[in-house]
Swiss-Prot record:
Belongs to the ThiC family. Catalyzes the synthesis of the hydroxymethylpyrimidine phosphate (HMP-P) moiety of thiamine from aminoimidazole ribotide (AIR) in a radical S-adenosyl-L-methionine (SAM)-dependent reaction. It is an enzyme of class 4 (lyase). Keywords: 4Fe-4S, Iron, Iron-sulfur, Lyase, Metal-binding, S-adenosyl-L-methionine, Thiamine biosynthesis, Zinc. It comes from the Bacteria. It catalyses: 5-amino-1-(5-phospho-beta-D-ribosyl)imidazole + S-adenosyl-L-methionine = 4-amino-2-methyl-5-(phosphooxymethyl)pyrimidine + CO + 5'-deoxyadenosine + formate + L-methionine + 3 H(+). This is Phosphomethylpyrimidine synthase. Zn(2+) binds at residues 437, 501. GO terms for biological process: thiamine biosynthetic process; thiamine diphosphate biosynthetic process.
Length: 631
């Protein structure tokens, strides 16, 4: 843990330097590859980890080696992971999906922004220095049209996004020839459908059934298509965002890039401070992954932070503002109903969701039903016009172990299931948010309740944290629950950083949270038996047994930390070819002893085989040539 504390000015300057010097960067001994689809502009990025050969024999002067296959892995870093791409944050990323969106001919550019707030911001010359310069002209569905991936899937259409995803989800595993690498234990998938090969048609069918979503706003053409669903790889979300007391636009863009480098499949911008609109524009124009928001946060800012003053009109304007900027999914707390709020009175920690508490306060102060629930169909109409997915928020999630799985939590979940069906009427894609704080033995019920109540819509959970006693280590306490619920069928895990319950995460906290959750997601994929999930583990184990230290570092989720820990005790280059590590030393290394046992067993087998042949030779009378009938 770093003890260096930077001033606000120093933090901003450091972030600005990061942005100014940003360039495409590969991980150690990795290279960016692209797998092309049926049309030339479907180019799916992957990272290929290059491995060194295995010494199999020969002499000191003439060693014999066997090549090890490169290992392809899923890559969320977009252009930031390609050294061949010139990065310019001021200009934003290339608009990868724009030709696909235009070719469908079901959307049109707007003459003006639909949001009054956006028009006010654009007219304010005082914001020119903060504003992203290359603003997109927003698009919206033509009259009578729907532009959602769910709509296309229901029409039987395989979109370029779906083909892109099918290639991406297969992770290049068809390239692997080694039986050692391809070996995989059968998993326990709790009813998930995990085909050996994911096809574009399978992607289409899962989206059409509502079991998966493709967050892909038509105004975010820079994003690389990805999918969230329990029959696909478990995904991880990272939260970023400024607050009234800390962080700047530069720092949030830096966190975005940093998040994609360390494996964030989506990023949520939870900004609540100044310049929310401008910060979000910079993030969207530079994001290769889907961006989610909680619109009620910004709507609250527009009424000076007074929950009672919120109105449907202010919220609707915020939805239009964010949809036309390109936000890919909205968290909407429409399930916090007036009649559920009293259920939380006997809780130890009450309502811990920020959005949930805002809506509960509004309901109580007006003694009216939640206006998000009352206007839900209008929300769906807006989402259908831009292809904004809905993430139905768990505003009544438990904030402590004591409150887990209570009446309030599951009452809201059942309402979210009802809202899911309404959203599907409008061809709007839906996922369901989940807890929270839940002890291990109570986690599986959350998954089974969600599947039943919400009609198998994808589940997206914050952890859950499995104990409340570890502030500063809640990435661990929640990572345990995340791995379990991912195994049971949760489609996406929202990361928790070491700063959870303590403060706003910095860049290093973001990395720690992401690494923890990538471990949890991968462990869940292994447990489910997701095809190809074990390839990287097998490659690591083989490298470990063969003392290929450089390959072990490079196959790690965090190669830099793995190398640093090794080099703390064996920094010399000779330590990277040694057949031992500092934990056991040369005489007690279990791997080295195992190799010696294997070599001894092989030699013994040869010796026993020779003895058997000798005995057989003597039994035949010691004749060099045998008669035909004796042979």
């Amino acid at each position: 843990m770093s003890t260096t504390t930077l001033t606000r000015r120093e933090q901003r300057a450091k972030a600005q330097h990061f942005i100014d010097t940003l360039e495409g960067t590969a991980f150690p001994n990795s290279k960016r590859i692209y797998v092309t689809g049926s049309q030339h502009d479907i180019r799916v990025p992957m990272r290929e980890i290059q491995l060194s050969p295995t010494l199999i024999g020969g002499s000191k002067d003439n060693p014999q080696f066997e090549e090890n296959e490169a290992v392809p892995v899923y890559d969320t870093s977009g252009p930031y992971g390609d050294p061949e791409v010139a990065i310019n944050v001021q200009q934003g990323l290339a608009k990868l999906r724009q030709p696909w969106i235009d070719a469908r001919n079901d959307s049109e550019e707007l003459d003006d922004r639909s949001s009054a707030y956006t028009r006010e911001r654009l007219a304010d010359d005082g914001l020119d220095d903060l504003r992203f310069t290359g603003l997109l002209t927003p698009k919206r569905a033509k009259a009578g049209k729907r532009v959602t991936q769910l709509h296309y899937a229901r029409q039987g259409i395989v979109t370029p996004e779906m083909e892109f995803i099918a290639i991406r989800e297969n992770m290049g595993r068809e390239r692997i020839r080694s039986e050692v690498l391809r070996h995989q234990h059968p998993g326990m998938n709790f009813g998930a459908r995990l085909p050996e090969n994911i096809t574009p048609e399978f992607v289409r069918d899962e989206v059409a059934a509502g079991r998966a979503i493709i967050p892909a706003n038509i105004n975010h053409p820079e994003s690389e298509p990805m999918i969230i669903g329990r029959n696909f790889l478990v995904k991880v979300n990272a939260n970023i965002g400024n607050s009234a007391v800390t962080s700047s636009i530069e720092e949030e863009v830096e966190k975005l890039v940093w998040s994609t480098r360390w494996g964030a499949d989506t990023v949520m911008d939870l900004s609540t401070g100044r310049y929310i609109h401008e910060t979000r524009e910079w993030i969207l124009r530079n994001s290769p992954v889907p961006i989610g928001t909680v619109p009620i946060y910004q709507a609250l800012e527009k009424v000076n932070g007074i929950a009672e003053d919120l109105t449907w009109e202010a919220f609707r304007d915020t939805l239009l503002e964010q949809a036309e900027q390109g936000v890919d999914y909205f968290t909407i707390h429409a399930g916090v109903l007036l009649r559920y709020v009293p259920m939380t009175a006997k809780r130890l920690t009450g309502i811990v969701s920020r959005g949930g508490s805002i809506m509960a306060k509004w309901c109580l102060s007006h003694h009216k039903e939640n206006f998000l629930f009352e206007h839900f169909r209008e929300i769906c109409e807006i989402c259908a016009a831009y292809d904004v997915s809905l993430s139905l928020g768990d505003g009544l999630r438990p904030g402590s172990i004591q409150d887990a799985n209570d009446e309030a939590q599951f009452s809201e979940l059942h309402t979210l299931g009802e809202l899911t069906k309404i959203a599907w009427e409008y061809d709007v894609q839906v996922m369901i948010e989940g807890p929270g704080h839940v002890p291990m033995h109570m986690i599986q019920r959350n998954m089974t309740e969600e599947l039943e109540s919400c009609h198998e819509a994808p589940f997206y959970t914050l952890g859950p944290l499995t104990t409340d006693i570890a502030p500063g280590y809640d990435h661990f306490t929640s990572g345990i629950g995340a791995a379990m619920i991912g195994w049971f069928g949760c489609a996406m895990l929202c990361y928790v950083t070491p700063k959870e319950h303590l403060g706003l995460p910095n860049k290093e906290d973001v990395k720690q949270g992401l690494i923890t959750y990538k471990i949890a997601a991968h462990a869940a994929d292994l447990a489910k038996g997701h095809p190809g999930a074990q390839i990287r583990d097998n490659a690591m184990s083989k490298a470990r047994f063969e003392f290929r230290w450089e390959d072990q570092f490079n196959l790690a989720l965090d190669p830099f930390t793995a190398r640093a820990y090794h080099d703390e005790t064996l920094p010399q280059e000779s330590g990277k070819v040694a057949h031992f590590c500092s934990m056991c030393g040369p005489k007690f290394c279990s791997m080295k002893i195992s190799q010696e046992v294997r070599d001894y067993a092989a030699a013994q087998a040869i010796e026993v085989g020779m003895a058997d042949m000798s005995e057989n030779f003597r039994a035949k009378g010691g004749e060099i040539y045998l008669k035909r009938e004796e042979a």
